[in-house]
Amino acid sequence: MATHKPINILEAFAAAPPPLDYVLPNMVAGTVGALVSPGGAGKSMLALQLAAQIAGGPDLLEVGELPTGPVIYLPAEDPPTAIHHRLHALGAHLSAEERQAVADGLLIQPLIGSLPNIMAPEWFDGLKRAAEGRRLMVLDTLRRFHIEEENASGPMAQVIGRMEAIAADTGCSIVFLHHASKGAAMMGAGDQQQASRGSSVLVDNIRWQSYLSSMTSAEAEEWGVDDDQRRFFVRFGVSKANYGAPFADRWFRRHDGGVLKPAVLERQRKSKGVPRGEA
């Protein structure tokens, strides 16, 4: 309590508040959020592309202009070679000037094999130091940054609380990548708030949650995509946002090296009164 100043209520009544600062669509700077998707959907590449944009790169995803600032991306699941492949693929879509801007503004520190644990004092302090002076920190994935039971609300509240403490003290937003539950993935419900694997605290205690979901057979039919091509399409949206106007979900197409770019799709009209196969 001693570290937090009380709010001057009369001053808040009278003075106009400063505008909200968004680090990602609907995500206020200095808060904690999540990107949830099934394994293999492309969330690591999406996170890398968003990190590169905030670091000073172009808006390849067409999610809108985002204020720039230093970013740190901590992949603890993939080896450096895999990160190199993603960067090489992404670099093919950047100009020399854009490459330099991203290199200057983005720090990538692979942690595979380091067993990071945000609940351990030395790791908490190290992550806090890494966040200082930065606009965004990406943790890839949440499971790699703690050793607690994911289905237990108490331990998960503490894990989220550690992230909130870092964000509050440094002003750096934290986005953790997380897997969708098997049930949500099988039912094509990856765009729902409760698609997140583990305790509901992982949804309830954060201010922002986005998703990346693979195209289902029904969606492929709706958008006129051949079934053997739908694996190239993923949908990105925000399933929980405590601030800001609604963010419209959008389709991305996976290109060489896994790079995501906006997909050009047209919703198909349904025929009326004509049985399938007779049109």
Curated annotation (Swiss-Prot):
Pfam families with a match to the protein in the record: AAA_25
Keyword ATP-binding: yes
Coiled-coil intervals: none
Key words, A-Z: ATP-binding, Nucleotide-binding, Plasmid, Plasmid copy control
GO biological process, one term: plasmid maintenance
GO molecular function annotation: ATP binding
ATP-binding recorded as keyword: yes
InterPro entries xref list: P-loop_NTPase, RepA
Top-rank taxon: Bacteria
Function summary: This protein is involved in regulating the plasmid copy-number. Increasing the level of this protein results in a higher plasmid copy-number.
UniProt-recorded name of the protein: Regulatory protein RepA
Species this protein is from: Escherichia coli
Top-level taxonomy: Bacteria, Pseudomonadati, Pseudomonadota, Gammaproteobacteria, Enterobacterales
